């Protein structure tokens, strides 16, 4: 999982990527290609 300062590029990397908020952090999850998982500080 990458830690990024901006998730704008991360959510457009793959069409299955979704932005979710968990425990006060912003995550990008991608079910079909988990390589693209990311979180924001």
From Swiss-Prot:
Keywords assigned by UniProt, alphabetized: Ribonucleoprotein, Ribosomal protein
Highest rank taxon of the organism: Bacteria
Q: Which Pfam families match?
A: Ribosomal_L36 (PF00444)
Q: Name one GO biological process term.
A: translation
Q: Is the Ribonucleoprotein keyword given for this protein?
A: yes
> Which molecular function terms from Gene Ontology are attached?
structural constituent of ribosome
- Give the family per the record: Belongs to the bacterial ribosomal protein bL36 family.
Q: What is the name attached to this protein's record?
A: Large ribosomal subunit protein bL36
Q: What is the lineage of its organism?
A: Bacteria, Pseudomonadati, Pseudomonadota, Gammaproteobacteria, Lysobacterales
What gene is this protein translated from?
A: rpmJ
